[in-house]
């Protein structure tokens, strides 16, 4: 079975593009938005609606395989690929990537995905945008699965020499800034890893001495115990801090380690990472 056509359409992601540089510089929350001017190239505001590109591969038997090109929240930060805007990258996919796919036999996901992952921009010589690689290889995986009349997990297991799990896999849930109410939802639904919490600002989220995050971890500990159905529910507490500990403690590793020990003690018996 072959790929006959590549179709792209603009979509939205589940979250936002946030200008991390502006947020770390002190941009203040305004509801779901931020007040201030963007500092990272490509941003027209500090928070923008996340954009995606849906890639549809039309197969020779009429089936359609799908993949979604999407980038991370903090696009353009710390050497990451630039802001992923659909209007900029749909033409790019059609001109650069699609010709590499059309007419290809769907015999191996690993082989074709490897080619896409190693593709370089003909003008810059750099690897193509991570969001494109992410979404196009998704579509290839779906296409190979459809060509073999099986599920994507079976294709991965076969080609990479592993087994499809017969047990539920832990899912990491993300609260965004609504870290209290959304944590409740996660606990009530039995999320295995929670809540992310988006601790991306020292003064408003971590606290100048770490006091705000410590208070939140204590609350989270108590909330799990209050809402869980039984003691068998032991979620992992995963907090993303975006380098704020280093800022708050002036990169003093001993102070950071002591603070992390304090957080772990507050989270116990739940594992904190």
Task: Give short role names for the model-derived ranges.
Residues 171-273:
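Metal-dependent enolase-superfamily TIM-barrel catalytic cores that perform enediolate-based chemistry
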Residues 47-49, 135, 163-165, 231-233:
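Solvent-exposed loop and beta-edge segments used for protein-protein assembly and interaction
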Residues 24-36, 144-148, 152-157, 161-165:
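Extended, Lys/Arg-enriched charged tracts that mediate electrostatic binding to polyanionic substrates
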Residues 39-42, 52-53, 138-139, 152-158, ...:
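Short alpha-helical segments and helix-capping/turn motifs at coil-helix boundaries
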Residues 1-56:
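Short, Gly/Pro- and small/polar-rich lid/capping loops
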Residues 58, 64-150:
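Metal- or metallocofactor-binding catalytic centers and their adjacent structured scaffolds
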Residues 58, 142-144, 157-186:
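Glycine-rich, aromatic-flanked loop segments that form ligand/cofactor-binding clefts
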Residues 126, 130, 134-138, 146, ...:
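Short, amphipathic alpha-helical segments
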